[in-house]
């Protein structure tokens, strides 16, 4: 995760880029080559970039209610920092110092943690940037090609300011479109699968446990993947309200629908990740790992290692959430999570 000595530097940089590309293009480049209607649409889209960006910065991601009590038959997650129980899919944000509902990641470019409540605002910002900069990039490509075809004409026929800005803005707009586009695709793919970036990392860790035969394949299945459109609507709300600056996600960020892999044959809910063990507020295990699995209606062999000694203990420690890295070298802390929950 990118960090800055002053976190607001991460906000100032995008502001400079957005202002420079949108303002100078609308004044010096586009008026000479597009209709007034197109120019108006570009200005409106640029305004939506600013509006969605400001909202993504100021709207909090959502935190559990102070009086939250976990269900008796559900998983019990306890945050040592907040000294309180928290719902499933909730993590403690190191930057904000609070637990965040359905935390996705901490974004240095908004200086905000992305969670259940502000995910639609964050996604709206990405989409508006992609559309606005994508349009500008296409227009710049057309303009540069025309300048190349007319390169033999006298220089006094060209507006030098426009030519210089077009040449500079072409690679700049491509860079913005490429980097933001990759992030948009990553977030959208996760959204389609009903998963957050943190949970995607968690799935990679669980898959490594399956390969080492520490967790069974049945227990490794992700329980929150319901159906394509349901997953999308749960994350960003209705497609009609998504385009409104105040559009909200579905649900409360506390309880979530699960697929069949999230329940036992008797209909009892299973915890995820499967190697989670319930703890009480005094940070004392309610019981050892195998007893905890039995209490949740699972077979102890789904975690073949358990809490043992020697080599197996070292292996289990390696796969713990605060130690493990994925193939890209990312740890849980790289998503802005302060590992204080047990």
From Swiss-Prot:
Keywords tagged on the record: Acyltransferase, Endoplasmic reticulum, Lipoprotein, Membrane, Palmitate, Transferase, Transmembrane, Transmembrane helix
GO cellular component, one term: Golgi apparatus
Protein name: Palmitoyltransferase PFA4
UniProt main location, coarse: endoplasmic reticulum
Cystine pairs: none
UniProt GO BP: protein targeting to membrane
Organism: Yarrowia lipolytica (strain CLIB 122 / E 150)
An MF annotation (GO) of this entry: protein-cysteine S-palmitoyltransferase activity
């Amino acid at each position: 995760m990118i960090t800055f000595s002053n976190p607001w530097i991460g906000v100032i940089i995008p502001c400079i880029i957005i202002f420079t590309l949108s303002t100078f293009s609308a004044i010096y480049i586009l008026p000479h080559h597009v209709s007034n209607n197109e120019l108006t649409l570009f200005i409106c889209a640029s305004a939506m970039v600013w509006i969605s960006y400001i909202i993504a910065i100021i709207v909090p991601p959502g935190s559990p209610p102070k009086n939250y009590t976990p269900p008796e038959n559900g998983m019990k997650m306890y945050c040592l920092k907040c000294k309180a129980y928290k719902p499933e899919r909730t993590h403690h944000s190191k930057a904000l110092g609070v637990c965040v509902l359905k935390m996705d990641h901490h974004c240095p470019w908004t200086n905000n943690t992305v969670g259940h409540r502000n995910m639609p605002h964050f996604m709206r910002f990405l989409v508006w940037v992609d559309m606005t900069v994508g349009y500008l990039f296409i227009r710049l490509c057309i303009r540069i090609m025309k300048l190349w075809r007319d390169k033999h004409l006298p220089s006094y026929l060209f507006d030098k300011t426009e030519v210089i800005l077009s040449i500079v803005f072409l690679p700049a707009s491509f860079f913005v479109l490429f980097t933001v586009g990759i992030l948009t695709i990553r977030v959208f793919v996760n959204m389609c699968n009903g998963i957050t970036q943190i949970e995607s990392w968690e799935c990679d860790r669980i898959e490594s446990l399956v390969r080492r035969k520490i967790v069974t394949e049945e227990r490794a299945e992700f329980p929150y993947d319901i159906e394509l459109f349901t997953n999308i609507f749960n994350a960003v709300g209705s497609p009609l309200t998504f385009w409104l600056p105040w559009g909200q996600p579905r649900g409360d960020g506390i309880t979530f629908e699960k697929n069949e892999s999230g329940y036992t044959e008797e209909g009892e809910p299973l915890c995820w990740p499967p190697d989670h063990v319930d703890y009480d507020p005094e940070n004392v295990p309610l019981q050892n790992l195998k007893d905890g699995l039995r209490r949740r209606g699972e077979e102890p062999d789904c975690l073949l290692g358990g809490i043992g000694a020697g080599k197996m203990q070292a292996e289990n420690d390696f796969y713990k959430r605060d130690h493990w890295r994925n193939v890209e070298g990312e740890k849980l802390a790289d998503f802005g999570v302060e590992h204080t929950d047990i």
